[in-house]
Amino acid sequence: MGRVEEESFRNGGLGRKVVRPALGGGLGVCERSMIANGQYQKKLEDLLIVCRKNLRSVNEDLIRRAFAMSLDAHKHDLRASGEPYFLHPYEVALVVAKEIALDDVSVAAALLHDVVEDTKFELKDIRAEFGDSVADIVDGATKITDIFESHEVRQAESYRKLLLSMVNDIRVMLIKFADRLHNMRTLEYLPPDKQ
């Protein structure tokens, strides 16, 4: 699962076990090396600076944990460009924080938006670690991906009706738009038939 350390967590008097990914713990040699020499740490700090500048309030612990889980979840994956896949959710989170200026929950969800569909992590892992708000947004983004990739829904009006009926939180749509925006910004790395 990529989960690294366990810790007890008390919430409202109810004890529950939370599994937290730790930076460096379950990561590959390349990622540990990049963290050790500050490459990913610099990206995390850059994201936090953007969040502090553009968001009303920032739960830095939430963003750090989402960053760590996303990095761990995508540690072996590469994009068509050859760069680490993790840079995609990172860039989506930057769009959400800088260009849309949503909130820290949305930034965390943006970092995690591909975790459920592309890795061994499940929605229950995200819910246990980050709570219902983040998990619900990630779940909505995953469902929207399924709709966009469906060949049955072809017309814009059908998309609109279907999406609006499924989405209770507009942040789901905005994160999905940020996801598509970053994908369009990096289209040159795909073969023409995939563009």
Predicted features, each with a name:
Residues 2, 9-10, 15-195:
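Active-site helical microenvironments for divalent-metal-assisted chemistry
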